[in-house]
């Protein structure tokens, strides 16, 4: 499948990557992992897919966890936002090493390393074949990068959000690491995900997606080529939408 939609408009997606993915399960950046992700993004862009990315910062800081250690929640969230920018710059570097023009836009102004977040400018970059990476979350505390991924996708008119997960290849009826009888959903309704508290994203982000009918595909990051397949629109993982829930065969 190519990056072209059925109409005249090219496919435009937002890829959500967790900070934990960048760290390979450790604090800091696992360059091998980030390089592989970059290498899998480029083929999809070359086939015409317009790719925006939101990156988390959990491999450096998490505001909620810092709060438990006695740090003010707002300040901890800002520390997490700065962590996302470090991840953005790392991914930008590896993408550019692959010859892919990339721009970083941040919700907190830091002109020496990134552009400010301007939706129309981001759209223009995408139309020119550049990858756009959004950093610093929403620029405000108490907003998760899951929520930011939905908000940004709506503002720049993405067809769907792609949630890359570690350790699972989609959304299951139960935690597959704890329940051997857990089944993967092929399709999942927003309401079922919310009512059953299934591991898609946080409730605020999922509610925003439901209210605006923004499709979400949840897939596993570990499999070779999975990022490329998801970007191209292949049916891997679990699609969360208004459709009825069905289990994978």
Swiss-Prot record:
UniProt xrefs under NCBIfam families: pyrH_bact (TIGR02075)
Protein name, entry field: Uridylate kinase
Subunit and interaction comment: Homohexamer.
Annotated Pfam families: AA_kinase
Domain of life: Bacteria
This protein's GO CC annotations: cytoplasm
PANTHER family: URIDYLATE KINASE, URIDYLATE KINASE PUMPKIN, CHLOROPLASTIC
Catalysed reaction equations from the record: UMP + ATP = UDP + ADP
Main location: cytoplasm
Record flagged with keyword Kinase: yes
Gene Ontology BP term (one): UDP biosynthetic process
Species of the source: Bifidobacterium adolescentis (strain ATCC 15703 / DSM 20083 / NCTC 11814 / E194a)
EC number: 2.7.4.22
Location(s) in or outside the cell: Cytoplasm
Activity control: Inhibited by UTP.
Binding residues for ATP: 16-19, 58, 62, 166, 172, 175
């Amino acid at each position: 499948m190519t990056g072209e939609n059925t109409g005249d408009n090219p496919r435009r997606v937002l890829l959500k990557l967790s900070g934990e993915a960048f760290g390979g399960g450790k604090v800091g950046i696992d360059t091998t992992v980030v390089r592989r992700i970059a290498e899998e993004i480029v083929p999809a862009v070359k086939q015409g897919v317009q790719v925006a990315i939101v990156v988390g910062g959990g491999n450096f800081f998490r505001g909620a966890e810092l709060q438990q250690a006695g740090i003010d929640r707002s300040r901890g969230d800002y520390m997490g936002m700065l962590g996302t920018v470090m991840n953005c710059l790392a991914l930008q570097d590896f993408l550019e090493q692959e010859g892919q023009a990339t721009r970083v836009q941040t919700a907190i102004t830091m002109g020496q390393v990134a552009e400010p977040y301007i939706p129309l400018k981001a759209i223009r970059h995408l139309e020119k074949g550049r990858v756009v990476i959004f950093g610093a979350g929403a620029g405000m505390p108490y907003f998760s990068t899951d929520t930011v991924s939905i908000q940004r996708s709506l503002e720049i008119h993405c067809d769907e959000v792609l949630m890359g997960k570690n350790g699972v290849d989609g959304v299951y009826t139960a935690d597959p690491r704890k329940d051997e009888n857990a089944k993967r959903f092929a399709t999942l309704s927003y309401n079922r995900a919310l009512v059953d508290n299934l591991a898609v994203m946080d409730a605020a982000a999922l509610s925003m997606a439901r209210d605006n009918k923004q499709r979400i595909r949840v897939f596993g990051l570990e499999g070779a080529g999975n990022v490329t397949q998801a970007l191209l629109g292949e049916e891997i993982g679990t699609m969360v939408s208004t459709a009825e829930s069905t289990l994978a065969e």
